[in-house]
């Protein structure tokens, strides 16, 4: 009897769970409580086999429960299996209960690839998305690297690993050949310094005219004149090395020593001397003008091109100072002092070769080459290391094979010259092996040099191509700015970016509100 009572009680308790609870009014009548007011009523808020309606960035689709059940660990799979509306709302950005539609403020292009993933089980990389943005989207939807298709996995991993190491850590280049926003921001900060400066607007225009050949017509004319002066200076330096001018200079020096005059008696050709003075005057005008117009004197002396300009005129003034000092301290030793002064002049004249680098201010290729060398120090270091190891090894082998022969292989340091020439495949032919073992060592040295030099050179060449394309893209962006001035273009880029971002957000919010308010007006979504 007791057993029956216990069983009956247990049966009543279980049965009571299946009967909806009711409330008793004042007359004693029972009325059922609505499902929404019953906590944990156990009635599902949507059928588990019902298709899932989603709206991702304005793209509406309906995904079948069977397709989502194949991937329960994804965000949409967990959304399909959500036990309550509150749990589902945690997985989406918004939910329209009237239409039964879930809204996600995410990239619609990636969502189309996500649909393909639910069909085939493989995810393909989108070229229009940055590798990091693609990874963020994949993480948001609950997809791992294992979901990537075999045809895209290697490319994705290579791009993801290479970008931070090559571009971010070393500050080499951005991910594309588009103009770099960091460089534009640097120019903006420089231009902003003129706002509080005296005659800031005029100084800014003059500075842009001298620094940017594509800024205006006067800047193009100034650039052409500057290039012409540089070429004339280089031509004068080359002409001065001709034998007839060297003989003229030597005769003048001898006449000076015989006459007992000071160093002022040595004179170059009058035409070349006047041309040199004109070039120095122009270079001095450029340096002083850029220094006076520069927004920051500290940044001026840190810029490589400005340092090249200073070095190009420094030898002339150092020569003048040396001549003045020599002329003021003559005590009957004119010949010896003249000899020392001639050596100093030769050294300073040799420094004039740096004027060739002034063309980098007007050449995209030279600037790209400088940027490539700046950001390829690792590759250059690897190249030098490979050459040092190869030269050391093959020089020792050549010394062992050729030390008995009188062919210039007397010591290992003497063999380093031969090893360097051979590994770089130059082959002057001044020192050659004659024994069979020496020839075999030379063959290995040449073949090893081809392999060793080719590996880093390829990487450096790829970087140069990237920098060159990026520089050309930046110049094209300046040229295609139309009637707007360059500083207006630069000052508006940040504002345009922020405005575009705000407009995009407003459009996204308006599109989402319109989607939620009038879902019936949209076309019937497809079921996947």
UniProtKB/Swiss-Prot annotation:
One of the GO BP terms on file: action potential
Subcellular location: Cell membrane
Bias (Polar residues) ranges: 519-528
Disordered: annotated segments: 497-528
UniProt GO cellular component terms: nucleoplasm; perinuclear region of cytoplasm; plasma membrane; voltage-gated potassium channel complex
Residue ranges that the UniProt entry lists as topological domain Extracellular: 240-270, 323-341, 400-412, 433-439
Superkingdom to which the source organism belongs: Eukaryota
Cytoplasmic side: 1-217, 294-304, 363-377, 469-528
Chain ranges for the short sequence motif Selectivity filter as given in the UniProt record: 425-430
Record remark: domains: The transmembrane segment S4 functions as a voltage-sensor and is characterized by a series of positively charged amino acids at every third position. Channel opening and closing is effected by a conformation change that affects the position and orientation of the voltage-sensor paddle formed by S3 and S4 within the membrane. A transmembrane electric field that is positive inside would push the positively charged S4 segment outwards, thereby opening the pore, while a field that is negative inside would pull the S4 segment inwards and close the pore.
Entry's family note: Belongs to the potassium channel family. S (TC 1.A.1.2) subfamily. Kv9.1/KCNS1 sub-subfamily.
UniProt name for this protein: Delayed-rectifier potassium channel regulatory subunit KCNS1
